[in-house]
From Swiss-Prot:
Catalytic activity of the protein: Endonucleolytic cleavage of RNA, removing 5'-extranucleotides from tRNA precursor
HAMAP family reported in the protein's UniProt record: RNase_P
Broad class of enzyme this protein falls into: hydrolase
Taxonomic path: Bacteria, Bacillati, Bacillota, Bacilli, Bacillales
Gene behind this protein: rnpA
This protein's name: Ribonuclease P protein component
InterPro entries the UniProt entry points to: Ribosomal_Su5_D2-typ_SF (IPR020568), Ribsml_uS5_D2-typ_fold_subgr (IPR014721), RNase_P (IPR000100), RNase_P_CS (IPR020539)
Organism of provenance: Oceanobacillus iheyensis (strain DSM 14371 / CIP 107618 / JCM 11309 / KCTC 3954 / HTE831)
Length: 121
């Protein structure tokens, strides 16, 4: 994934946590906030040490990055998205992680082919 699509700075993570919206399922927690001044989405990944050793954490991050790469054309631009992996992801393969991620993004209206969530309220 290109560097311009990544969130790396701690301040950006913290700002997304404080000012953004969140939603979750058993496997993933997603925080997001809209940034109208950017023309593409950016992602930040967090996999804690409770998940497993470095090999396990890196495998989960690779799966999440690959899932975003495959979903890239469908994700709405101008969002910062932070994903936190939970413990059940250690037993999932990449296909299951992608399915869980795409379901959450669809549910929250962050995919282009979904209706805006605010129009449902």
């Amino acid at each position: 994934m290109k560097k311009q699509y990544r969130i790396k700075q701690n301040e950006e993570f913290q700002y997304t946590f404080k000012k953004g919206h969140s939603f979750a399922n058993r496997q993933l927690v997603i925080y997001y906030r809209e940034k109208e001044d950017q023309c593409h989405f950016r992602i930040g990944l967090s996999v804690g040490k409770k998940i497993g050793n470095a090999v396990m954490r890196n495998r989960i991050k690779r799966c999440l990055r690959q899932s975003f790469h495959e979903l890239e054309p469908d994700i709405k631009p101008a969002y910062d998205i932070v994903i936190i992996a939970r413990n059940p992801t250690r037993n999932m393969n990449c296909g299951e992680i992608k399915k869980s991620l795409s379901h959450l993004l669809y549910k929250e209206g962050l995919l282009k082919n979904t209706r805006n969530k605010t129009s449902l309220r």
